[in-house]
């Protein structure tokens, strides 16, 4: 089956925003936030939860993306993957597979089992999962042309539901540096959804959603970016190509020797989140993202 490139991209953007809504809800709603902040060391966290709530937030976003895209594009079922296992064991020893049910009520019922009967938290999560989300996007009309059709039986999806989880949990606030790059905090958190050719591994479409882009009183507003490079079409949501900045963005865990060598030629900015660092390069805030360790990988 062939799918319209514009409608496929719009579907990914919509579900990225639903994922962002879930991420924001987990920090905004008191009942959910109490669970979220329990992610500490094994000794400190509430032993009532066998798997921490942070992991459930990750998994719920991942399964929501899988459900939404699989429902709209059945050819993708079985080829939408993420980094989290969706199997949980509650304190009663029950093994539960987290998945999105047909109704909000059924999803809440399943989630309450994972959360050891905390129905209030389960209801709040299920509400966001089943909420209709359609976000305005400035996708060029040319992606709606009949020559921009995608063979869905060749496409795979990879999801990183909450990138920079530590910053998401801690929820600290940082000021941007002179290049407008945030080195830590909620602004480094991203939801990453990518479509790729599952035969060659070549990336085709990517969406990066920043759930915590702009603080607005007691709430947050997000933003998103997209890019397309497939079937001879190359487009993205950036208004202009980036200009050189002589800046390298990297993780603070890189070796001192590497940093010393780079500092001879570039200004270094240590920032959280692999997705956020890549986004900083795409936005032209930095020239290069350097990663010398095996903590981040390309999925094939």
What are these regions (language model features)?
Residues 29, 86-88, 165, 197, ...:
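Short loop/turn segments at secondary-structure transitions that flank enzyme active sites
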Residues 148-228:
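DPxDG-like acidic metal-binding loop motif
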């Amino acid at each position: 089956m062939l799918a319209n490139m514009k409608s496929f991209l719009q579907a990914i953007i919509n579900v990225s925003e639903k994922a962002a809504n879930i991420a924001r809800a987990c920090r905004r709603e008191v009942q959910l936030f109490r669970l979220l902040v329990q992610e500490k060391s094994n000794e400190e966290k509430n032993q009532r939860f066998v798997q921490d709530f942070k992991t459930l937030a990750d998994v719920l976003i991942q399964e929501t993306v899988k459900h939404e895209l699989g429902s709209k594009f059945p050819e993708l079922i079985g080829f939408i993957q993420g980094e989290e296992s969706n199997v949980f064991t509650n304190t009663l020893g029950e093994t539960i597979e987290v998945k999105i049910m047909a109704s909000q009520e059924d999803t809440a019922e399943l989630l309450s089992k994972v959360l050891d009967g905390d129905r209030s938290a389960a209801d709040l999560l299920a509400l966001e999962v089943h909420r209709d989300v359609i976000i305005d996007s400035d996708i060029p009309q040319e992606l709606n042309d009949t020559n921009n059709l995608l063979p869905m039986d060749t496409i795979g999806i990879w999801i990183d539901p909450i990138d920079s989880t530590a910053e998401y949990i801690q929820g600290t606030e940082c000021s941007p540096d002179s290049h407008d790059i945030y080195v830590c905090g909620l602004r480094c958190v991203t939801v990453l959804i990518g479509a790729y050719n599952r035969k060659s591994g070549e990336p085709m479409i990517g969406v990066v959603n920043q759930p915590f882009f702009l603080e607005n009183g007691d709430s947050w507003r997000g933003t998103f970016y997209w890019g397309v490079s497939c079937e001879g079409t190359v487009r993205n949501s950036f208004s202009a190509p980036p200009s050189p900045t002589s800046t390298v963005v990297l993780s603070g865990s890189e070796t001192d020797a590497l940093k010393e060598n780079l500092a001879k030629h570039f200004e270094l900015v240590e920032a959280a989140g692999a997705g956020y660092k890549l986004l900083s390069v795409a936005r032209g805030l930095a020239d290069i993202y350097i990663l010398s360790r095996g903590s981040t990988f390309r999925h094939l």
